[in-house]
Structure formats: structure tokens, C-alpha cells
């Protein structure tokens, strides 16, 4: 099955299932990584046209091990819409892969309740990573209508790093930065994720396993950038307390 064929079938998953309740465990802070991500993202120029909503592709690994994080992301996605609302709004397209060569994308969504409803109807299934399909899909989408950013959340990489690097470079040429958020510390995944971020002119950040509060900060930052660029992200940083203030002081 090709990436194009898999994406073309998308729109929604037809097998609804309730999301599990995900807690917010007290994990060790990954604050330096989060601050580094925000610092990098603040250097990127905004590409949102006046009067238009920002467009963000929200991509998730939905293989079997990812169910707890999927449930967390389902709860946190509303944070992105809330963060972007005061800036000019946001449209999000959910993209996910799971099972045997299954990779799907939803329509563009401007409502958190609708996105949550779609996400709670999707269950994770065993399978290998399909990050290359996500990168290729992001390129095709921005060729149809400009996307401001790609966010990818995952913990593993089982593909050829050279192929992923080439696809990430294509996104960079089209002005679509990839914000790659790694759960855990797999070194193979980290190497690939850092390359994807670098070649797309995006940013990489690691967060602790199950740390909802860390992922929340990252998703809000990505949404701020997609909706309003550097200025919006700088404004968000100014509201985030001591960690963000320390970041601003370092950047002076």
C-alpha cells in the first residue's frame, strides 16, 4: 500500500472505542529540553497570512505501545486550540499510523471537541513506524495549501534515516518546520528525530514518559507558532512562569 493510497482512505476511523483515562504522573522535569525547543521555535519566521487561521499537521505514532500517550494527547489537543484562539485561530489535521501499513489523515478541523471525538474513536494497534509517510503527506498538503508547521509525537524509528532526512529536507524547502517531540530516550529515534527537525528547520524536544504537563507545554508552544509565529510564541513564553523567564533572560 502506498502512502498516497493510505492517506486517501483516511477521513476517520470507523471503529470507535473509548479513550483510557490518562493520569499526569510526577515525572522528572525535562525543562531544559522544553526551553531549548521554545528558544529554537522562536527564531522561526511566521508564514501566516493576515486574516487566516494557522494550519498545523498533528501527527502521532498510534502503534500498540503508544495508547497511554494517545489518551493524553486526546485530552491535551484542546490546549492548542485555546492557545491559538486569541492569536487568530488554528486548523489542525490529525495524521496517524498504526497496524500493517495503515496511515490516515482527517480533514482540517477548527474545533477541539470535534478533534477529541475523532481521537477517542481511534485505538492503537501493533505495527512498525511509518514516519516517512507522514513527512510525504505533509509535503503534499502544503503544496495544496500552506501549512505552518508539522508536529510529530513518537518514541521509536524503524525506517531508513537517509530516506527520512531527504523527506525532511523537502519540508524545509517548502517552509514547513517539523517540531518533533520524543517520548522517552531511545537513541536511534533521537538521532533520526533530531535530523528531521534540523533539515526541516524545525525543533526537537524530548519529554518524559507519561509526562502530560511537559507535552502540554510543547503542544501549546507549537500551536502558538503555527497561529502567530515568533511574536505569539514570545508572548506565550512571557506567561509561562520562572522557566520561561529564565529562557528569555538567556536569549537577551
Predicted segments, located by residue:
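Von Willebrand factor
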Residues: 51-107, 111-153, 157-162, 184-194
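DG-centered beta-turn motif at the end of beta-strands
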Residues: 58-61, 147-160, 178, 182-184, ...
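Charged helix-capping and loop-helix junction motifs
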Residues: 163-167
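C-terminal "exit" segments of structured domains
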Residues: 200, 204-252
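Acidic, Ser/Thr-rich peripheral helices and adjacent loops at domain boundaries
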Residues: 107-120, 197-209
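Acidic, polar low-complexity linker/tail segments
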Residues: 2-57, 64-71, 86-88
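Short, structured coil segments at secondary-structure junctions
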Residues: 174, 192, 199-200
Amino acid at each position: 500500500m502506498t502512502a498516497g493510497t493510505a492517506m486517501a482512505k483516511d477521513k476517520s476511523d470507523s471503529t470507535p472505542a473509548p479513550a483510557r483515562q490518562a493520569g499526569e504522573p510526577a515525572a522528572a522535569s525535562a525543562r531544559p529540553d522544553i526551553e531549548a525547543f521554545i528558544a529554537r521555535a522562536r527564531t522561526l519566521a511566521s508564514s501566516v497570512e493576515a486574516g487566516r487561521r494557522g494550519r498545523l499537521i498533528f501527527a502521532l505514532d498510534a502503534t500498540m505501545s503508544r495508547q497511554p500517550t494517545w489518551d493524553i494527547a486526546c485530552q491535551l489537543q484542546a490546549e492548542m486550540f485555546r492557545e491559538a484562539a486569541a492569536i487568530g485561530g488554528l486548523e489542525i489535521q490529525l495524521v496517524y499510523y498504526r497496524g500493517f501499513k495503515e496511515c490516515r489523515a482527517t480533514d482540517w478541523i477548527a474545533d477541539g471537541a470535534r478533534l477529541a471525538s475523532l481521537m477517542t474513536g481511534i485505538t492503537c494497534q501493533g505495527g512498525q513506524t511509518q514516519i516517512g509517510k507522514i513527512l510525504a503527506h505533509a509535503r503534499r498538503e502544503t503544496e495544496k495549501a500552506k501549512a505552518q508547521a508539522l508536529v510529530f509525537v513518537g518514541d521509536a524509528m524503524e525506517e531508513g534515516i537517509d530516506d527520512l532526512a531527504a523527506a525532511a529536507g523537502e519540508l524545509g524547502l517548502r517552509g514547513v518546520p517539523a517540531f518533533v517531540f520524543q517520548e522517552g530516550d531511545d537513541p536511534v529515534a533521537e538521532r533520526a528525530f533530531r535530523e528531521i527537525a534540523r533539515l526541516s528547520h524545525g525543533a526537537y524536544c524530548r519529554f518524559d514518559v507519561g509526562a502530560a504537563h511537559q507535552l502540554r507545554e510543547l503542544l501549546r508552544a507549537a500551536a502558538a507558532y503555527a497561529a502567530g509565529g515568533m511574536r505569539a510564541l514570545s508572548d506565550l513564553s512571557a506567561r509561562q512562569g520562572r522557566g520561561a523567564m529564565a529562557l528569555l533572560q538567556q536569549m537577551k
